[in-house]
């Protein structure tokens, strides 16, 4: 499944381990791709050499969009680049 690929800061997680989708790189990617976030939306989130799939939720407590991810499923992107070239 083709999911939009959006920048996220993996150090900007809330107390529940969800990534906050409010940093400048995220906002720029969303704007450039003309994406409006909604609950349940599936995204691929990346930061430098890491990426992970996540589902969007709105955090009422913080009034910010977040993405629920499985921290054990984070992938190193350069591994996939090397495999694709082989």
Where are these regions (language model features)?
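Glycine- and charge-enriched low-complexity intrinsically disordered segments
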Residues: 2-3, 61-86
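Short, basic/aromatic beta-hairpin or loop at an interaction surface
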Residues: 6-25
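Short alpha-helix capping/helix-loop boundary micro-motifs
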Residues: 23-33
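Short, well-ordered loop/turn sites that connect or cap secondary structure elements
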Residues: 36-38
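Short, charged beta-turn/beta-strand-edge "cap" motif at the junction between a beta-strand
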Residues: 42, 46-52
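Short beta-strand-centered aromatic/proline hotspots
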Residues: 50-61
């Amino acid at each position: 499944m083709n999911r939009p690929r959006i920048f996220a800061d993996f150090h900007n997680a809330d107390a529940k381990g969800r990534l906050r989708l409010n940093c400048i790189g995220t906002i720029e990617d969303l704007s450039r791709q003309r994406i409006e976030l909604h609950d349940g939306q599936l995204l691929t989130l990346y930061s430098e050499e890491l990426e992970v799939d996540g589902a969007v939720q709105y955090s009422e407590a913080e009034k910010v969009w977040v993405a629920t991810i499985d921290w054990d499923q984070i992938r190193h992107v350069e591994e996939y680049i090397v495999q694709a070239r082989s």
